[in-house]
Amino acid sequence: MRKKECIAMLLAGGQGSRLGCLTRNIPKPAVSFAGKYRIIDFSLSNCSNSNIDTVGVLTQYKPFALNTYINMGSAWDLNCLNGGIHILPPFVGEAQGSWYKGTANAIYQNMDFINFYNPEYILILSGDHIYQMDYYEMLSCHKQKHAEVTLSAIAVPWEEASRFGVMVTDAGGRIIRFEEKPPRPESNLASMGVYIFNWDVLKEALLEDERDPQSDHDFGKNVLPRLLQQGRRLYSYLFHGYWRDVGTIESYYNANMEVLQEERVDKFFELKQRVFSNEEILAPQHLGERAKIHNSLIGNGCTILGEVRDSVIASGVYVGEGSLIEQSILLPNSEIYEDVRLHKTILGENAIVRAHCRIGDKREGNPPQEGITVIGDHLHIPEGTVISEGENVRKDTA
């Protein structure tokens, strides 16, 4: 038994079905973001920068790419001997074991791992948000208020509040009510999916939840409301920084485009600590004689022979002569051949678009700013193909 004050459990097994074909072969935390990162980089970097050196990463859906990317955790300085990073897939033991049935059940199935370190506090994280937070400051607040559970919270627009777990607090920040994704929210204070529990409180709550046959075994739906009913001390930790939930195609696209906006980019990059990634070491970008770049982010290892405008281009991408890329996101190692027009499109990893294609063509009658075209990873789009805006292409086109 190795005593740790606080360890982190990072939930990274979600399929991310709302991201469509972007998560056909990989889980949501492994999806590329802003040209050089994976979504999970932000939570792992937060742990490293907050001196939390023991992290359990709970994987489930198609985990190979994520496991390979994380490796031993050295990119985030989490390859230490006493602690470090641990990949925790579902397993079958003598008395228990199955696929994770919910966020709470995922932690329940790994109680032996937690008990090995015998922590006083447990930090529960989601691996699919873009933000930077000092978890140590949150833990200090948790201690000062003698809280049993602390939830990080952020004010969101009222029209978006129903997408989140929302809380009502008193003047001191103590949570009075909590409801997961209410149809008519009474607050716009949203849970960020970052929790600190006293381990003894969480252990008891998980055991009780597992005994309930009616439970969905979910923190937001079951565990937190039950703790409130029991009169436990739940507090909010108000976060004022940059935070984005990128769980839908629209939110993922918009968050990437924000990196290019002058009024947003300063806030995104005013990070107090570095965001680490396990990015492959590649040569610098190569720009051809006729290449034109305007307000775009170009990753390492790219070859750009055409024109790129208002776009995020990840590492290892090829754009051929005479091609025009506008308001698009090209994920790692994708290829665009000659004379291609790509508009407001997300092109998956290792996808290939042959010459003379027109992708994201405007449909008559659609309002402006609608219709993000998505091409799945490893797909081949034949020469001369026309794909209208808003289509979600999951398999090779004939």
UniProtKB/Swiss-Prot annotation:
Keyword Nucleotidyltransferase: yes
GO terms for MF: ATP binding; glucose-1-phosphate adenylyltransferase activity
GO biological process, one term: glycogen biosynthetic process
Binding site for alpha-D-glucose 1-phosphate: Y100, G165, E180, K181, S191
Keywords assigned by UniProt, alphabetized: ATP-binding, Carbohydrate metabolism, Glycogen biosynthesis, Glycogen metabolism, Nucleotide-binding, Nucleotidyltransferase, Transferase
Catalytic activity: alpha-D-glucose 1-phosphate + ATP + H(+) = ADP-alpha-D-glucose + diphosphate
Disulfide bond residue pairs: none
Superkingdom field: Bacteria
Annotated pathway: Glycan biosynthesis; glycogen biosynthesis
EC number: 2.7.7.27
Alphabetized InterPro entries for the sequence: ADP-Glc_PPase (IPR011831), ADP_Glu_pyroP_CS (IPR005836), GlgC_bac (IPR023049), GlmU/GlgC-like_hexapep (IPR056818), NTP_transferase_dom (IPR005835), Nucleotide-diphossugar_trans (IPR029044), Trimer_LpxA-like_sf (IPR011004)
Function: Involved in the biosynthesis of ADP-glucose, a building block required for the elongation reactions to produce glycogen. Catalyzes the reaction between ATP and alpha-D-glucose 1-phosphate (G1P) to produce pyrophosphate and ADP-Glc.
Protein family (similarity comment): Belongs to the bacterial/plant glucose-1-phosphate adenylyltransferase family.
Subunit-structure text: Homotetramer.
Record-linked HAMAP family: GlgC
Full protein name: Glucose-1-phosphate adenylyltransferase
Organism of provenance: Desulfitobacterium hafniense (strain DSM 10664 / DCB-2)
UniProt gene name: glgC
